[in-house]
Regions:
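Helical "lid/switch" subdomain of P-loop NTPase nucleotide-binding domains
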Residues: 129, 149, 153, 161, ...
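Charged catalytic carboxylate motif
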Residues: 129, 160, 164, 300, ...
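Hydrophobic residues in beta-strands of the RecA-like P-loop NTPase core, especially within AAA+ ATPase
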Residues: 32, 151, 165-166, 182
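Charged, glycine-rich active-site and insertion segments that engage polyanionic ligands
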Residues: 1-50, 60, 67-68, 174-176, ...
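Conserved catalytic/switch belt of AAA+ P-loop NTPases
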Residues: 138, 163-179
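Conserved amphipathic alpha-helical interaction elements at protein-protein interfaces in regulatory
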Residues: 53, 139, 170-171, 373
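Clamp-loader machinery-focused feature within the broader ASCE/P-loop NTPase space
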Residues: 1-160
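A broadly conserved amphipathic alpha-helix scaffold signal in soluble, globular proteins
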Residues: 131-135, 167-170, 214
Length: 376
């Protein structure tokens, strides 16, 4: 049973995974993988803190009392290295990243020129950042204990950066633990996977995820939403409670420039357009949605097509049950072979969703292909 502190920091559906960990015989590298937005990152940050904790052997880790725990909470632990793209740095223990050179112990890496790179580039971990982080490992532990390097999302590593990481995994520095996270483990190099202990983060069932989400929302002052609206958004976003929470908080704070908020708004417009079937204005839809995260739009399209395929086969929609009437109407007009081919196109597109050239042109091509599903 987890203590109340860890229970509040770790999502309940991840409690069994935490309790299965053997801190006395912890591997030098783990690869935690699972759906985006289900709490993997929060789990891993807490794990890093536990591995760096200097409390007594008999005490639960992290103890939250020792100097190492306090340093970690302020974002200044010298033996913690985080390697995450700019889009994820707000999820780390707080620290003044604005004045840092990239990368430093306890702090995330910045671009060499200190300026934000292009939108898609912000999601990529560069070879320079990776090399500097690995070089920091060779200096030695400041506290005489473990050193922990957290890398997320692992699939965002460029091939040259992944090869640099692979060399360190093949000959790991003493007392160094790699915590690697991936939303799509199939995109991680097999050679990297083979050198890690694989841990699967389970997705919560709908009731569990919604219970957790509603509890978090109840603690936000001034936020008022009906349970029906919360459940609708939860289903639309594929049952990822952490992602839904982030988007609702951003909307509550009226942060219209938040990347997740932009993507959710675009996704809703995209689905409204796709609900028109063969009457979709794919040029207009691409124009009004292409500034959102391409990966987010692709995921929404996949969920819609998955539901449409289910209805075509006589089943029920999983993600958009409120659109069952629309889906049933589309299913009667859909060319099954073209529908299957479109699904394959989406799968192929997701393999390259983070490529710098993934943009409006690709989105237009997919939406045009979608329209043809309902042609004569």
């Amino acid at each position: 049973m987890l203590d109340s502190y860890k229970a509040s920091r770790i999502a309940p559906w991840l409690h069994p995974l935490w309790e299965s960990l053997d801190f006395a015989k912890f591997p030098n590298a783990i690869l935690l993988h699972g759906q985006s937005g289900i709490g993997k990152f929060a789990f891993s940050v807490e794990l890093a803190k536990a591995l760096l904790c200097e409390g007594s052997e008999s005490a639960a880790k992290p103890c939250n009392q020792c100097e190492a725990c306090h340093w970690f909470d302020t974002g200044n632990h010298p033996d913690f290295i985080s390697l995450v793209p700019e889009t994820h740095r707000k999820l780390l223990p707080h620290a003044d990243y604005e004045s840092d050179d990239a990368p430093k112990r306890g702090k995330a890496a910045r671009d060499d020129d200190g300026e934000p790179s292009e939108k898609k580039e912000k999601k990529i971990i560069s070879i320079e950042e990776t090399r500097q982080a690995i070089e920091n490992l060779s200096i030695g532990s400041h506290r005489g204990g473990n050193r922990v390097i957290l890398i997320y999302p692992l699939e965002m590593l460029r091939s040259d950066a992944a090869n640099t990481l692979l060399k360190s995994l093949e000959e790991p520095p003493a007392n160094t633990i790699f915590i690697l996270l991936a939303d799509r483990v199939d995109r991680v190099l097999p050679t990297i996977r083979s050198r890690c202990r694989l841990l699967t983060a389970p997705r919560p069932d709908r009731a569990q995820g919604l219970t957790w989400l509603k509890r978090q929302l109840s603690n936000i002052s001034g936020l008022k939403m009906s349970e029906v609206d919360v459940e609708t958004i939860y289903d639309e976003q594929g049952g990822a409670p952490f992602s839904v929470l982030d988007s609702l908080v951003a909307r509550h704070n009226k942060d219209d420039k938040d990347e997740l908020t932009i993507s959710i708004q675009a996704s809703r417009y995209l689905l409204q357009s796709m609900a028109q079937g063969g009457r979709i204005n794919w040029l207009d839809t691409a124009e009004k949605t292409h500034k959102a995260q391409y990966a987010f739009l692709l995921a929404s399209m996949q969920r819609w097509i998955s539901d449409l395929q289910s209805v075509v086969q006589g089943g029920e929609p999983r993600y958009y049950p409120k659109h069952v009437t629309t889906l049933q109407g589309l299913s009667r007009m859909a060319n099954v072979q073209k529908l299957l081919q479109f699904w394959k196109s989406l799968v192929q597109a997701r393999r390259h969703e983070n490529h710098p050239l993934a943009n409006r042109i690709q989105l237009e091509a997919l939406l045009s292909q979608y329209q043809q599903i309902f042609g004569s």
